[in-house]
Amino acid sequence: MSETKRVRVRYAPSPTGFLHIGNARTALFNYLFARHNDGDFIIRIEDTDAKRNIADGEESQMTNLKWLGMDWDEGVDVPGKYGPYRQSERQSIYEPLIQELLDKDLAYKCYCTEEELDAEREKQKANGEMPRYSGKCRHLTKEQQAEKEAQGFKPSIRFKVPANETITFNDMVKDDVSFESNGIGDFVIAKKDGIPTYNFAVAVDDHLMEISHVLRGDDHISNTPKQILIYNAFGWEPPIFGHMTLIVNESRRKLSKRDGSIIQFIEQYRDLGYLPEALFNFIAMLGWSPEGEEEIFSKEEFIKMFDPKRLSKSPALFDNVKLTWVNNQYVKKLPLNDVVELSLPHLQKAGVVSAELNQAELDWVHKLVSLYHEQMSYGAEIVPLSEMFFADAESITFDEEETAVLAEETVPTVISAFKKELEALEVLEAAEVKAAIKRVQKETGVKGKGLFMPIRIVTTGEMHGPELPLAIEVLGREKVLNRLDTWLKNN
């Protein structure tokens, strides 16, 4: 392909499911490559497998790509001169090209039933052979074909794979890759209903849409020789291919939609209150890295830096700890009002704050969220982080370490004195709480951890957490006194 040819890349999802983290990465790398080269980024919907398509699959793809911060130059919602951009609307384009291959004797009609093909595959497996079509229908005469059709058999169309050829291409990630044609077998390019198969439709669409580079997952690499053969059959120049390594989990296994340890879909991250800029940043580093040690970049910086030569040849590790860290870096930079906006729906969904808040209640939520602003990684995390603020005194339990602290003989004296100090305060404010703790220290002679730790454990139910006077202010006078009183009655 000429190096001066305009860069045109595509993300071509099938609407058979929602936007998955792996597909999002494919889209994102294509987007960055297009924008870096002042080229075109195209969204094409590959929806020819009608049985597997789901109602909201296409919408999920588009909505969540936009949410992540991507836009495109052509697609089902951005008309261009290379449309239609749904494969289901391109049947009239495919049919004459399939006929052209038949006319050139580069394809043939196959009347084999699924049962026959299954039996053939099983026999090959039993013999230790690689399953591939035997070519049974390749040499049928016109008369034999007519006889099959008279018997009611509908043909699929198979591509005639040339024998004894080596198909080689230079991959942007893997360098030179070769396949032997003898290992491929004649493959179907149109099903019995006339609908083209994936490999045929993709090759045709990529050519007619003038796609210059095909950047996709490693799981597609076995499709590439078939697509190159189709290009060669029509005398077309193939695009430049690049196959990204797969994403793996912490066990180094391919990321699977059945893997419950990792959230798989962009919509789920969105619903949990992750920031799109943070997720964009994290995904962009899955199998690609810039020079240097820095890991936080803006979209504009990624566009400026992106070079497919820096795509990793090793599988990309999906690191949940890194994901949390990256999101936290972005949350920390947000103004408090934005973090409250991110958190509030989750507090309401959990039922710990009302759906309709007055100003005093909203002010309280601001105070609550401010305690965890530096710690939070995503909106929904506010619920487990702040659960101590909503627990009843009777439901608070202490672990072994906390129980050991509360077993010290000075603890009842400290708790009793602190309760007395708070009862004298009409309003609990952090400064007043701090002063009250100092007075307890003076009165009891207990200081340091022996003073602060029992007060923290009894009032918050936790050994560690936000600054104690602030936490007590947010808890409120009634709740704190109730917890102190409950502990004293039980000990």
UniProtKB/Swiss-Prot annotation:
Summary of subunit composition and partner proteins: Monomer.
Catalytic class of the enzyme: ligase
A single GO cellular-component term on record: cytosol
Reaction catalysed by this enzyme: tRNA(Glu) + L-glutamate + ATP = L-glutamyl-tRNA(Glu) + AMP + diphosphate
Cofactor, free-text remark: Binds 1 zinc ion per subunit.
Residues involved in ATP binding: 257
GO molecular function: ATP binding; glutamate-tRNA ligase activity; tRNA binding; zinc ion binding
Keyword Ligase: yes
Protein location: Cytoplasm
Motif 'HIGH' region, residue numbers: 13-23
Cofactors: Zn(2+)
GO biological process, one term: glutamyl-tRNA aminoacylation
EC numbers on record: 6.1.1.17
UniProtKB keywords: Aminoacyl-tRNA synthetase, ATP-binding, Cytoplasm, Ligase, Metal-binding, Nucleotide-binding, Protein biosynthesis, Zinc
CDD domains found in the cross-reference section: GluRS_core
PROSITE patterns recorded: AA_TRNA_LIGASE_I (PS00178)
Name of protein: Glutamate--tRNA ligase
Cited function: Catalyzes the attachment of glutamate to tRNA(Glu) in a two-step reaction: glutamate is first activated by ATP to form Glu-AMP and then transferred to the acceptor end of tRNA(Glu).
InterPro entries named in the record: aa-tRNA-synth_I_cd-bd (IPR045462), aa-tRNA-synth_I_codon-bd_sub2 (IPR020751), aa-tRNA-synth_I_CS (IPR001412), aa_tRNA-synth_I_cd-bd_sf (IPR008925), Glu-tRNA-ligase_bac/mito (IPR004527), Glu/Gln-tRNA-synth (IPR000924), Glu/Gln-tRNA-synth_Ib_cat-dom (IPR020058), GluQ/Sye (IPR049940)
Similarity remark: Belongs to the class-I aminoacyl-tRNA synthetase family. Glutamate--tRNA ligase type 1 subfamily.
Any matching Pfam family: tRNA-synt_1c
Residue interval(s) of motif 'KMSKS' region: 254-258
